[in-house]
């Protein structure tokens, strides 16, 4: 079986693809339930899939449902590789607000994953070499099969922040003022002004992309995203260029 494909070369999520890319759901619970089914379908279709995961409130219930289904249905996860989409810079990885702690608590530990099943940025060692290390690890695995994302309040994707230009590759980013007020950073005890993130090229190279749009304070970013006009002012708008892109939206 080729990377990122089911038997016969079909999309891993083909059975879920509607005529349109956009799927509106009634509430956060329904969105999370459907997203977990997508994830489970990918895992069943390709047991050694490489799946990039966003963190935070948006995908939290999705991951809870996914873990629940995996245990209930006794799905083998021993060959999976998960990739951390981004991380705050200059915070110890063990702090409560880090993306590392989030994934450890909601994916790695509940599923009993081995250490080598998570490709992760090390926030204590952030430099361009760290970008290269993570990029190379993903490449050795054959690239991303699925990237699970959330829409930021300012339209960011991962920590690819709005601006006059965007960096395609994995990079260290200067955080937008709104991102610096992120819920996850409320326990940091210090200002956090930088992040490290996979770039838009890394995301768009994934075989499948699943975007979750839900949460308070995102109406403006959602409205601008839904125009389907690609702009560096809304990094998430670049997902409209992807051929296997599904957006679940609860507005």
Swiss-Prot record:
Annotated PANTHER family: GLUCOSAMINE-6-PHOSPHATE ISOMERASE (PTHR11280:SF5)
PROSITE patterns hit by this protein: GLC_GALNAC_ISOMERASE
Disulfide cysteine pairs (residue numbers): none
Organism the protein comes from: Escherichia coli (strain K12)
Mutant phenotype after disruption: Deletion of the gene does not affect growth on N-acetyl-D-galactosamine, D-galactosamine or N-acetyl-D-glucosamine.
Source superkingdom: Bacteria
Gene: agaI
CDD domains xref list: GlcN6P_deaminase
Gene3D superfamilies to which the protein is assigned, alphabetical: 3.40.50.1360
Enzyme class of the recorded protein, top EC level: hydrolase
Protein's recorded name: Putative deaminase AgaI
Keywords: Hydrolase
């Amino acid at each position: 079986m080729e990377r990122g494909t089911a038997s016969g070369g079909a999309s891993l999520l083909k059975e879920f693809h509607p005529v349109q890319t956009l799927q509106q759901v009634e509430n956060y619970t329904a969105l999370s339930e459907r997203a977990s089914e997508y994830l489970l379908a990918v895992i069943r279709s390709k047991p050694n899939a490489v799946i990039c995961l966003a963190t935070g409130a948006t995908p939290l219930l999705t991951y809870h449902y996914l873990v629940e289904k995996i245990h209930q249905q006794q799905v083998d996860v021993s060959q999976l590789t998960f990739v951390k989409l981004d991380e705050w810079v200059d915070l110890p990885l063990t702090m409560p607000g880090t993306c590392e702690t989030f994934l450890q608590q909601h994916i790695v530990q509940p599923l009993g994953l081995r250490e080598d099943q998570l490709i992760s940025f090390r926030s204590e060692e952030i430099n361009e070499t760290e970008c290269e290390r993570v990029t190379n690890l993903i490449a050795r695995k054959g690239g991303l099969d699925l990237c699970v994302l959330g829409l930021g309040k300012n339209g960011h994707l991962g920590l690819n922040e709005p601006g006059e230009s965007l960096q395609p590759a994995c990079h260290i980013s200067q955080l937008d003022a709104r991102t610096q007020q992120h819920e996850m950073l409320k326990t940091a005890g210090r200002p956090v002004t930088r992040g490290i993130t996979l770039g838009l090229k890394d995301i768009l190279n994934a075989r499948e992309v699943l975007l979750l749009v839900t949460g308070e304070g995102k109406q403006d970013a959602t409205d601008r995203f839904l125009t389907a006009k690609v702009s560096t002012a809304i990094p998430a708008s670049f997902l409209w260029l992807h051929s296997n892109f599904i957006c679940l939206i609860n507005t």
